[in-house]
Amino acid sequence: MITASLLPLPATSSSSGRRSLPPPTTTFPRPPPPLRRHRHLSSSSSSASSTESDGGGGSTNGSLPGLPPVVVEEEEEEFCPVECVTEFKTEEELARVLERAKATGALVVVDFFRPSCGSCKYIEQGFMKLCKGSGDHGSSVVFLKHNVIDEYDEQSEVADRLRIKVVPLFHFYKNGVLLEAFATRDKERIIAAIQKYTAPSSPPAESEEPSQEG
């Protein structure tokens, strides 16, 4: 009894010596990869190859070969908190700060600025860094700032009273007295002035008594 087999039959030779060919199979074309994915891989591979070439064949940013490089964000230098540089708007506010500073012997540094001033924006970052590091030197320094343009886009009463004509301008007060004022965008000049007015006073030199000969 002959039963039907579900397995393919092996190729047999015909009587004429030719092998019988297997039945033709239908093949379907492979769909191309998505264009967006292709661009992502190519850009990733190029980024990885450029990173490897720069780092001597290895990844310099922690990414594995063949994978997109890890983007490492540079840590920005930490600035002082907002309350470190206090902004005042009226002459009365400035007077209160100067009075408190007089009681503690602190130096008061005031930055007069204008929002549209490029040099003011430039020195602002350095001024904030000075404020943040002021406690490291053991000296008491109070940092203030004042916008010379009021909400009506006119010169403020404080700027008018103090005759502020140029910005950025820095005032240095101690014991309620204005010691120095100058316009600058040089942080080193501000540092020099702070050090000058916060340096401990040197003790007076002891006078030598003339030796008495007996």
Swiss-Prot record:
Q: Which GO terms describe its cellular component?
A: chloroplast
Ranges for domain Thioredoxin: 72-199
What are the disulphide bonds in this sequence? C117-C120
Keyword Acetylation included in the entry's annotation = no
**What does the record give as the active site?**
C117 (nucleophile), C120 (nucleophile)
The reply to whether Plastid figures as a keyword in the UniProt entry is yes
- Summary of the function given for this chain in its UniProt record: Probable thiol-disulfide oxidoreductase that may participate in various redox reactions.
Q: Per its record, how is this protein called by name?
A: Thioredoxin-like 4, chloroplastic
Provide this UniProt record's keywords sorted from A to Z: Chloroplast, Disulfide bond, Electron transport, Plastid, Redox-active center, Transit peptide, Transport
Which InterPro entries did the record assign?
A: Thioredoxin-like_sf (IPR036249), Thioredoxin_domain (IPR013766), TRL4_chloroplastic (IPR044176)
Organelle targeting sequence = 1-71
Record's signal peptide? none
- Family, similarity comment: Belongs to the thioredoxin family.
Where does this protein have compositionally biased stretches of type Low complexity? 1-20, 42-53
Q: Where is the composition biased (Pro residues)?
A: 21-34
Q: Where is this region: Disordered?
A: 1-68
What is the native source organism of this protein? Oryza sativa subsp. japonica
Q: Where does this protein reside within or beyond the cell?
A: Plastid, Chloroplast
The record, for Pfam families, names: Thioredoxin
